[in-house]
Amino acid sequence: MAEAIGAVSLVGHRPSIVRITVKNELKTQKSQSIVRFPVKVDYSAKGVLSHLMTQSVKKNRMSVFPIRALAMELTKEKKKDDRLPKTWNYLDSGADDKPSLWPPENKADKPSLHNPLLRQERMGCGWLGAIFEWEGVLIEDNPDLDNQSWLTLAQEEGKSPPPAFMLRRVEGMKNEQAISEVLCWSRDPVQVRRMAKRKEEIFKALHGGVYRLRDGSQEFVNVLMNNKIPMALVSTRPRETLENAVGSIGIRKFFSVIVASEDVYRGKPDPEMFIYAAQLLDFIPERCIVFGNSNQTIEAAHDGRMKCVAVASKHPIYELGAAELVVRRLDELSIIDLKKLADTDLTEFEPELEMEKEDERELPSSAVAVDDF
């Protein structure tokens, strides 16, 4: 009967259950349930035609319950799946026992607000935060000054000058992280902090304390402020240096959050700086857009579940293809572009990835022993 019910329900007509009373040989009344289909089949023509029955079916309490043919099929599949061996060596069939909800839960929603208008605003694509890097994004950057600082520090400390590939690797890292983990000049925390401080002093002497905004940066941050989009500034420079630089060019009022090297333990490509800035802005990572100029920034932003806009200031555009958007100047972007990046149909609705458990079984040895004759 289940197959017949499923076949008829596919036509689009819902069957109904009707209870009737019958008498058996002992003249005792017995109530039975039958299934009645509101279709009439005509076999007189060449093809089989179905017509809706005009007569109304008497409604009762049982007629309001639909026939769940699909549920019966799923029950059969569930029983078959239960018979499979449940061991770690068995590959999962792909069937998920947990019921899934649609639409998925929006991570931007915050029921504790108790304000439907604020909740609706948070779930819209206009609720987003901007996280800017400092050098090469907002101001002009000269990477040769950093390289010269490392070479000068190596000469003062009596170390061998780091090669070019190692200097490229330490870009975006904290000075302490680069000295102890990449350059391997010292593991003593006191010596590491001393050399990191000395490196910044050399950089400031070479730089001269003159900062110049990149073309289009001032206009873009003005647009974001007019649209009430909160902004954060992150850098691996010391806070004192960063505060003085931001104040000297008059853009301190645009940033509600500033994250410096003292606030985090590791620099790029670790996403710690960006995640901490998102927490201070009170935004979920999926609604934050990072503006950087290197592949280390793109990697860190994606590891933190954020979108990234790359500015081609020191790298060509084709090397920054991993970012969601690549521009030469910030004023090439519009609010519509940012809203599309913050759209809730992106990674916000995707399930978080879980690490697969490795198979720790010992494989049999493939060696073959041969007796010597």
UniProtKB/Swiss-Prot annotation:
GO terms for biological process: protein phosphorylation; riboflavin biosynthetic process. Transmembrane segments: none annotated. Optimum pH is 6-8. Its cofactor is Mg(2+). It is found in: Plastid, Chloroplast. Keywords: Chloroplast, Hydrolase, Plastid, Riboflavin biosynthesis, Transit peptide. InterPro entries: HAD-like_sf (IPR036412), HAD-SF_hydro_IA (IPR006439), HAD_2 (IPR041492), HAD_sf (IPR023214), PGP-like_dom2 (IPR023198). It catalyses: 5-amino-6-(5-phospho-D-ribitylamino)uracil + H2O = 5-amino-6-(D-ribitylamino)uracil + phosphate. It is an enzyme of class 3 (hydrolase). The keyword S-adenosyl-L-methionine does not apply. GO terms for molecular function: 5-amino-6-(5-phosphoribitylamino)uracil phosphatase activity. It comes from the Eukaryota. One of its GO terms (cellular component) is chloroplast. Pfam families: HAD_2. Optimum temperature is 40-50 degrees Celsius. SUPFAM superfamilies: HAD-like. Its EC number is 3.1.3.104. Homodimer. Catalyzes the dephosphorylation of 5-amino-6-(5-phospho-D-ribitylamino)uracil, also known as ARPP, but has no activity toward flavin mononucleotide (FMN). Belongs to the HAD-like hydrolase superfamily. DOG/GPP family. This is 5-amino-6-(5-phospho-D-ribitylamino)uracil phosphatase, chloroplastic. It comes from Arabidopsis thaliana.
